[in-house]
Every structure is written in C-alpha cells, then in structure tokens.
Curated annotation (Swiss-Prot):
Sorted UniProt keywords: Cytoplasm, Protein biosynthesis
Protein name as catalogued: Ribosome-recycling factor
Function: Responsible for the release of ribosomes from messenger RNA at the termination of protein biosynthesis. May increase the efficiency of translation by recycling ribosomes from one round of translation to another.
Assigned protein family: Belongs to the RRF family.
Cited InterPro entries: Ribosome_recyc_fac, Ribosome_recyc_fac_dom, RRF_sf
Gene3D superfamilies from the UniProt entry: 3.30.1360.40, Ribosome-recycling factor
GO biological process: translational termination
Lineage: Bacteria, Bacillati, Bacillota, Bacilli, Lactobacillales
Annotated compartments: Cytoplasm
A Gene Ontology cellular-component term: cytoplasm
Length: 185
C-alpha cells in the first residue's frame, strides 16, 4: 500500500515535469522552435483547431519557421490566428506558405524572459510540493486507520521526501538550462 502512494506521487511529479517542459518550449529563445506554435489555434471550418493539426511546421533556418497548410484554403485563417496570437512575430504569407522570422532578442527581453522562466519553474515546484503534501496526508490517513505502523509511516515520509527532493532538483536543472539558453547571445 505504501508503494502505491509513492508510485502515484512519482507519476504526478513526472506529469509536472512534462508540463513544465511544454511551458518552457513555448518561451521563445531567439531560435526557431516548432513548440512556439503549440498554443496557436485556428478557426478552421467553424472549429478551433490546433495549428499543428492543419499544417506542417518546419524549420528551414535557425530563426525561421515555415508553416505549410495541408489545405491551401486555410492559409488566410492561419495567418489571422498567428496575427492574433501573443507571439510578437509577424507572419509573411507568400501565397502557399507562411514564414515566421524569429527576431533576435534584446538584452532586456532576455532578462524579462529569464524572470518568466524562474516564475514558471517556481510554480512547478509549488505543484510538486502540493503533490508531496497530498502523499503525506494519504500516508497519515493509512497510519490512523492502522493500515501501516508508525515506523512504516516514518519510512514512507522519508521516501516521499526523497522523491520530492529529486523532482525539485530536476525542476531546478530544467529552469537553469532554459535560463542559460535564453541569456546566451
């Protein structure tokens, strides 16, 4: 029963890591990255559709994204969605594809993005600590219900704390790597 609590906590913490990685992917670092467009949704035949489901996204150069729609009639809708997004990148429509040239980041923008990365990383650590709290509460409930002994509870709490420490360290590493990526010119 104790292993179930730890496995459940590990699984939820892994989901937090994956969520953080997706969030970091959406923060542009002056280089083209297809995940920048993950949050862009296009009005396609009356339905909000993720851009990556109606177009292929390629990276022909280090700072250029090329969006090639599967259906050429959706080109204007895609361009409209990209203009409405908060990417800060102006799309260039050449009739068959849309080019997105990623502008170089200024020093000030880099610092602002680094602050945002820290904030996102801190939110991920808070989520992990909440998962730890839930796991600890579950362990204490089991001890109260006499399903586990007090000694088993102490061991379980140590194991949960170790898993949490590992998860927080992983988040710190991810955050430091993203900050380094942002701040290098």
């Amino acid at each position: 029963m104790a292993n179930v609590i730890i496995e459940k906590a590990k699984e939820r913490m892994t989901q937090s890591h994956q969520s953080l990685a997706r969030e970091f992917g959406g923060i542009r670092a002056g280089r083209a990255n297809a995940s920048l467009l993950d949050r862009v949704h296009v009005e396609y035949y009356g339905v909000e559709t993720p851009l990556n489901q109606i177009a292929s996204i390629t990276i022909p150069e280090a700072r250029v994204l090329l969006v090639t729609p599967f259906d050429k009639s959706s080109l204007k809708d895609i361009e409209r969605a990209l203009n409405a997004s908060d990417l800060g990148i102006t799309p260039a429509n050449d009739g068959s594809v849309i080019r997105l040239v990623i502008p170089a980041l200024t020093e000030e923008t880099r610092r602002d993005l680094a602050k945002e990365v820290k904030k996102v990383g801190e939110n991920a650590k808070v989520a992990v600590r909440n998962i730890r709290r839930d796991a600890m509460d579950e362990a204490k409930k089991q001890e109260k219900a006499k399903e586990i002994t007090e000694d088993e509870l102490k061991t379980l709490e140590k194991d949960i704390q170790k898993v949490t420490d590992d998860a927080v360290k992983h988040i710190d590493d991810m955050t430091a790597n993203k900050e380094k990526e942002l701040l290098e010119v």
